[in-house]
Amino acid sequence: MKFRVVAFFALACFAYPAFAGDPSPQIKRGQQVVLAGGCNDCHTPLKMGSKGPEPDMSRMLSGHPENVVLPPPPPLTEAWNNVGSATNTAFAGPWGISYAINLTPDAETGIGKWLEKDFIQAIKSGRHMGVGRDIQPPMPWEAYRHLSESDLKAAFAYLKSIPPIRNKVPAYVPPAK
């Protein structure tokens, strides 16, 4: 019995990263900002649960799943001028097709190489990394740009503290001309 307990804890050390203690107050505040801002609503894919769609927390904040290839969106009318995917991570409308990006700190597919200033500028300006293409609907950057710089820094610190998830989100598709 003693061997099993020791073996369990030894394996647990390899299965999970070392516990670094309580998160800093900034990371705790960042988690509050991310949760209150509803970032999981679009950046965490939905999966079908026993009571209907629910967030797939194994993919928390990883954006549109790279393995989910969508058909062309249905025709839109004035009455129905935008549609969303079943994962709630892809959206089509007059702006084209937009995909929720990977907000995890994965260096290749997420925001792992972003600097704090890139993140703040993106939210304040509505441009990818603060200088790139426009951030597309339904991302409510127009509302988030009113967050304080300290709240945006906290949100970025929190996002950089979560586990990285490798997930290459498809590129934005402009509207057909």
Each language-model region and where it sits:
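Surface-exposed patches in mature extracellular/periplasmic domains of secreted proteins
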Residues: 41-44, 131-136, 166-173
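Acidic helix-start/capping segments at beta-turn-to-alpha-helix junctions
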Residues: 44-67, 173-176
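The canonical Cys-X-X-Cys-His
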Residues: 30, 36-46, 119, 155, ...
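Electron-transfer interface patches adjacent to heme c in soluble/periplasmic c-type cytochromes
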Residues: 59-118, 142-152
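Electrostatic cytochrome c docking/interface patches
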Residues: 18-35, 47-53, 69-72, 109
